[in-house]
Amino acid sequence: ASRQIDSFIKWAKKQDWYTNTTIAVMGDHEMMAAPEIVGFANNEMTHYWLNFFINPVKTTERRKRFFSSLDFFPTILESIGAEIPQGALGLGRSLYSNQPTLLEKYGKDSIDNVLKKRSVEYDYFLYYKKGKK
C-alpha cells in the first residue's frame, strides 16, 4: 500500500491541479516503523496509525493529539479551507483548532460507555416504518 501511495503522490505532483489540491491519507490499521521516522523519540510508541495531509490550506503546530475518526470530518473540511465556528462539527473536533477532542476531554473509557448506550432517537430513525405512528 505504501508503494501505491508513493506512486500516486509522485503522479499527482506532475498534474496541473496538484498545488491547489489537498490530499488526505487516513490509516485504517496500525503500522510498525522506526519511531523517529514519524516523530516519536525514545521508542515511546512502536505501533500507531499514520494519518497525514499534503498541501493543506491550514497548518498546526500541535503534533500529538488524542483523536478518533469522528474528528476527521471537521479536520478534512478545515484542511481545504472551510471555516468551522468553534472548530466542531457533530461529535468531531478539528485537529487544526485549539478545541479538545472528545477523547482528550473525557477519555476513551468514558466515550466508549456513552456511545454504547441505547438512543431512542437513533432507534426511531433506524426502525421507524412509514405509515406507523
Task: Annotate each predicted stretch with a short phrase.
Residues 2-39, 77:
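Metal-dependent active-site segment of extracytoplasmic phospho-/sulfohydrolases and closely related
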Residues 18, 44-46, 90:
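A generic fold-level signal
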Residues 20-21, 26, 46-49, 67:
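Active-site lining segments that contact anionic ligands and/or coordinate catalytic metals
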Residues 39-41, 63-64:
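Alpha-helix capping and helix-loop boundary segments enriched in small/acidic/polar residues
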Residues 40-52:
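Flexible glycine/proline-rich, aromatic-decorated loop/lid segments
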